[in-house]
Amino acid sequence: MLGGLGLAWAAATQGLPPGALLLSRVRAHMREELARLPNCSCLETVTRDHQPAGGVMRPLDTIRLEVLYSDRREIYASPGDRGFRDNQPMDFTGSGLIGNGHFALFLSEIAGEGSLSYEYKGEESLSGRRLARYDYRVPLNMSGNTITVPEGRGTVGIKGSFWADPATYDILRIAAEAEDIPPSLPIVEYVTVIDYAHTNLAGTDFLLPQSADYRLLEFSGELSRNHIEFTHCHLYGAQSSVSFGARGEPPRFAASSVLEMNRELLPALQVVIRISTRITEKTTVGALILGVVEGNVLRRKSVLIPDGSPVRGRVRRLEWNDEKGGSYIVGLEFTEIEAAGTRYRFFADLVDTDRLPGLSRTISMFRHETDTLPYGGSMTRDSHDVLFLPDLPGVGSFFVQARQLDLPPGFRTTWKTRALVP
């Protein structure tokens, strides 16, 4: 009887459109992920650029906010402030473009029980991974997306795409464009791109936003652009404690019931972290990194952080980049240090690392290009570009030009602590 049912199921699935079965599994999986998403907060770093009508794009400012996801809502506070309020991020900026809804809004629309339209577009390569792409549409009457500008506020429909891992069913990127924009909003185009990655919170992996990009074009010709990075995510209402195993074993972190998050370290301290976790090209983004502080960290000749204090973080970025013969882009995010019973949030700039073959903080690109002139002949141009990676508190990013990646246990990174507010 079971064999007959299996044959009937196989015959039924053979008649499905391409990608339909995978879509069903992706949506079901994402509903489960959203249902178990805990109360958690992250540091949100927003880099804003603005181009006036007829002008050129220039940096506007950098904003940092604490964002708390709770009960399918996002609420905000100033960095280091635990007094979250039910407000919009624009309340902290006064003007300019800034968006929200990264944790659940876009994912909920895709994974929800509503009857949206989907179209399978095949597999595409994204950051070195083969992902299934789907186009989708959220009609205005089913949309929870709103745009707020100084001229007003309005709900918009969405047409977009998402990319899902066929093996894990995780949605790893969403690209959404507003449509059916109300006439009261002076907007020509509004585009959002969100990347998701696994983040380990108190020993459990959750799918959280890692970065987002926004682009808003107004009728006037003004163009606003945002890049957002989410770092230092942790459970809200729980704090980790640390226990040590046998000699030589890396420290272990566990959850305890403490409302307040850890304290912030003073700026301008030099901290050397020796990693206990081996990192290779097979390590997944979001994987937990454990390490220890090497050498005492002093303040006014007193030991603030003793040698051997445990450090915790995650692999924030690990992807293959084809530029200049190929290299790995590696981002290591350290979030907390435990010292003498006090847990410190780790905000610091990467200063140095151990030397490894092919490891560098930047990559130089030399280009030799020949252009054909309209009236005959040609012109040769040489250019020199430097690739560099974003500067985020507590995140060390670098390139490794090698076909295989191996950051061994004992690999050391040197940091200088910084103030949270720039």
Predicted regions and their residues:
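Intrinsically disordered, low-complexity, compositionally biased regions/tails
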Residues: 7-10, 87, 380-381, 400
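Bacterial N-terminal signal peptides
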Residues: 1-6
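Structured extracytoplasmic
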Residues: 11-158, 166-172, 177-264, 421-422
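Hydrophobic beta-strand positions
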Residues: 123, 163-164, 336-337
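Active-site and channel-lining beta-strand-loop segments
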Residues: 159-165, 298-299
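Glycine-rich, flexible loop segments associated with nucleotide phosphate handling
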Residues: 151-161, 329, 402
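Contiguous beta-sheet cores, especially beta-hairpins with glycine/small-residue-rich turns
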Residues: 172, 197, 260-422
